[in-house]
Amino acid sequence: MSFLEHFLDKEQQKPEVLAVRQAAKTRIFEVQEVDLRFANGAERTYERLTPSRKPAVMVLPVENGELIMVREYAVGPERYELTCVKGLIDAGETPEQAARRELQEEIGLAAATLTPLRALYSSPSHMFGLMHVFIAEDLRASKLEGDEPEPLVPVRVPLAQLDALVGDEALGNSQTLAALMLLQRKRPELFQAA
C-alpha cells in the first residue's frame, strides 16, 4: 500500500459521466465538456483540455556536477523560461526512446544511462498531461534535427546551486520544479559530490 492510499477513501464512489462533448478543437488541443453526477446527486459540467492524450517526457541531463537545462520561449507567460529537455512521445515510441530522441534534438547529447524517476500528471483536474521524468547520465555529443522554431539554449546549472534555483520565483514551470525536487530526493548522492 502506498503512503497516499492511507488518505484516500476506497469506498468513495467516482462520479458518473453523463456526457462528453467537444467544445472546441485546435491543431494541438481539444476542449471537452464533461457532465458529471456525483454520489450525492450534485451535477456539474467540467471542462478539460485533451492534447490527444499523448504522454510526454522530461529529461534531466547531469554531467560533471551540473544539470543541463534549456532556455525556451513559453507562450503562456509570454517570456523565456528555464526548463528541462522535454517533448511528446511519438506514435510507436516508448517513453525511454522519446527521452533519448528529445535529448539529442534539443541539446545535441545522447545518454548511455537513462534512469526513470517517475511519471507525473501536470494538471489532472483539467487534462491528461502525463509526463515521464528521466535522469540522463554518461553523456556524449549526438545531434538529431528537431522541430523547435529556434535553437534552444543549453544552460548549465551547478547541482550545488539547485536549492537556489528551486527557490527562485522566476522559475515558474511547475513540472520543472517537481522534476528538480524529485532529482534531489531520489539521487542525493549527486548533490554530495557537487
What are these regions (language model features)?
Residues S2-P15, S52, Y80, A91, ...:
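Nudix hydrolase/Nudix homology domain
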Residues Q12, L49, A56-R101, R118:
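Conserved Nudix-box catalytic region and its N-terminal flanking loop in Nudix hydrolases
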Residues V20-M58, E63:
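Acidic, metal-coordinating catalytic segment for phosphate/diphosphate chemistry
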Residues E33-D35, P61, I135-E137, R156-P158:
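Short, well-ordered beta-strand micro-motif
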Residues D35-F38, S123-S142:
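Active-site-adjacent beta-strand/loop module that shapes the phosphate/pyrophosphate-binding cleft
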Residues A110-L117:
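A short coil-to-beta-strand element that immediately follows conserved catalytic motifs
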